[in-house]
Design a protein with these regions (language model features):
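Short flexible coil/turn linkers enriched for glycine and charged/polar residues
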Residues: 85, 139-140, 166, 207, ...
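Pseudouridine synthases involved in rRNA/tRNA modification
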Residues: 1-31, 79, 194, 203-210, ...
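Secretory N-termini
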Residues: 114, 199-202
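RNA pseudouridine synthases
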Residues: 1-184, 188, 293-298
Length: 303
């Protein structure tokens, strides 16, 4: 897999191994140095050394060899199925449930569960680690997720994701009381330059990201909101709400305030998903039941 980067003037004179370490968050600096030694990283079509300092307009091509993965096995893990036919499966993903395997984490994921449930009826466009997976939600975010059962459906849904035509509505509880009852956050999101596993508002290397929000209910110190996505960037709602000083309750990455409640990650639920069905070519929409912990917060805990 190749990645191409053009160096911005603001980032010149940084060592290339550090520069790429900030951009390729899934890989260590040591691994990047290994790629450099093996001539898998070229600057302006030429090999380089790890201590090379990048210059404005440098074209950097990073060729990451395909890793060798362990076998991914089907596992009999219960699924909360919202809808299923020959083309798609809609599941309500619970908290603390990783969508797909990754190096060092090959079991106990949604992929293991759908491989058991669907047998061989899954798209294979995304390879052995992500059969059937056309999009994903964070480990501690609950709610509706589309699984594609064949390659045609996968491509059909992917096109709608690219066109931003899929309806994706979330509900979430944020810190503080919002002054505006509805609004739009339009701010590009990219990798944090220092904290590699985090995202941030990034005007230089970020990708376009748009979130609509609407207040559903206000509490003394919190607000229940509905969010609708135009784009689907990693951690989009979490980053956007933190950027306006209303991070999600329980978010252990973007909310730096101590949570007074025992929560397992952010209070965020993918409530609604709608799309043009690959077979019928008609619009369909599905809702994922709100988890009990979320309902308890709204009805009994928050005042």
């Amino acid at each position: 897999m190749s990645n191409i980067f053009i160096v911005d003037e603001e980032l010149q004179d940084i060592r290339i191994d550090k520069y790429l370490n900030d951009l390729l968050s899934d890989h260590s600096r040591t691994y990047i140095q290994k790629l450099i030694k093996e001539n898998n990283i070229l600057v302006n079509d030429k090999p380089c050394k790890a201590n090379y300092k990048v210059q404005a307009e440098d074209k950097i091509v990073v060729d990451i060899p395909e890793p060798v993965y362990a076998n991914i096995e089907p596992e009999d893990i219960p699924l909360d199925i919202i809808y299923e036919d020959n083309d798609v499966l809609i599941v309500n993903k619970p908290k603390n449930f990783v969508v797909h395997p990754a190096p060092g984490h090959y079991s106990g994921t949604l992929v293991n569960a759908i491989m058991y449930h669907c047998k061989d009826n899954l798209s294979n466009i995304n390879g052995v680690l992500r059969p059937g997976i056309v999009h994903r939600i964070d480990k501690d975010t609950t709610g509706a997720l589309i699984v594609c059962k064949n390659d045609f459906s996968h491509n059909f849904i992917t096109e709608q994701l690219k066109e931003h035509s899929i309806t994706r509505k979330y509900i979430g509880i944020v810190q503080g009381v919002l002054k505006d009852f509805e609004g739009i956050i339009d701010a590009p999101i990219g990798r944090h330059p220092i904290k590699r596993k985090e995202m941030c508002i990034n005007e230089i290397n970020g990708k376009n990201a748009v979130t609509h929000f609407k207040v559903l209910k206000q509490f003394r110190n919190n607000t229940l909101c509905e969010f609708q996505l135009e784009t689907g960037r990693t951690h989009q709602i979490r980053v956007h709400m933190a950027s306006i000083n209303h991070p999600l309750l329980g978010d252990d990455i973007y909310n730096h305030n101590k949570c007074p409640y025992k929560l397992q990650g952010q209070c965020l639920h993918a409530k609604t998903i709608g799309f043009i069905h690959p077979a019928s070519k008609e619009y369909v929409e599905f809702e994922a039941a709100t988890p009990e912990y979320f309902k308890n917060l709204i009805n009994n805990v928050l005042k």
